[in-house]
């Protein structure tokens, strides 16, 4: 079985669906993201971007979550479409 091609969440485009694969960073950061529903196996899509492009809003677990690109770069995803 081959490893999936992973991208950072910051690279996800509006028309793409993805599954969260792994999260890097400190324990505190991982805990904070997990408390917001950012966990391995969750489906995530881009909802919209701010006028300057950062932060971006994502659809996850039936709600919209805003994340800075600085945080999104620590979240690795596998494209689903």
Give the location of each predicted region:
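Compact, glycine-rich, soluble single-domain proteins
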Residues: 1-81
């Amino acid at each position: 079985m081959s490893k999936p091609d992973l991208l950072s969440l910051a690279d996800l485009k509006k028309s793409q669906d993805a599954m969260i694969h792994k999260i890097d960073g400190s324990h505190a950061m991982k805990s904070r993201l997990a408390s917001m529903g950012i966990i391995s196996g969750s489906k995530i899509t881009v909802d919209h971007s701010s006028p300057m492009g950062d932060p971006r809003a994502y659809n996850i677990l039936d709600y919209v979550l805003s994340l800075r690109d600085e945080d999104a770069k620590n979240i690795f995803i596998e494209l689903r479409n």
